[in-house]
Regions:
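Acidic/aromatic-lined carbohydrate-recognition and catalytic surfaces
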Residues: 2-153
């Protein structure tokens, strides 16, 4: 059997160009036509895409801040003011966790997503994994991101 040879680019979404600390599903992503992506779950310890807190959830780092500006729940100035680290070509996961988390919480507080029928339907359809995941991540946040074996009783 003769196989056709081909070539491509392996590009982590996080490596796409972005002024907001990490590549995401914004216009820059659409500029790449044929590409394979690494796992896109929320990264765990060591920020590896292969060590995720969920097999089903998406990584919130990949939410396009430009789309949130277009929706009116963030401003371009808020995004520009955020400190994602000093080097534009290096992902600073510590700053990313702080700044993108802050911006995403701010966007959520300004949104009416709770009244969005598509969002409500998504939550209902996926509650078999989403409820436990949301609870786990909320408790993890309460314990400052520590591993669950270090949580207080």
């Amino acid at each position: 059997m003769k196989m056709q040879r081909s070539a491509g680019i392996l590009l982590p979404i996080s490596s796409l160009p972005s002024p907001y600390g990490i590549g995401c599903f914004s216009q820059e992503a659409y500029d790449f036509v044929d590409w394979q992506i690494l796992p896109i779950g929320p990264t765990g310890y060591g920020d590896s895409p292969y060590q995720s807190f969920s097999a089903f959830a998406g990584n919130p780092y990949f939410i396009s801040l430009d789309a949130l500006v277009e929706e009116g729940v963030l401003t371009a100035a808020e995004c520009k003011k955020a400190n994602f680290g000093r080097k534009a070509d290096d992902i600073n996961y510590s700053r990313l966790y702080t700044e993108r988390g802050r911006l995403l919480r701010l966007a959520y507080s300004r949104s009416d997503i709770g009244h969005n029928e598509a969002f409500t339907a998504f939550c209902e359809k996926n509650k078999w994994w989403l409820d436990d995941f949301a609870l786990f991540m909320a408790v993890k946040d309460r314990f400052e991101g520590k591993p669950w074996i270090e949580w207080a009783e």
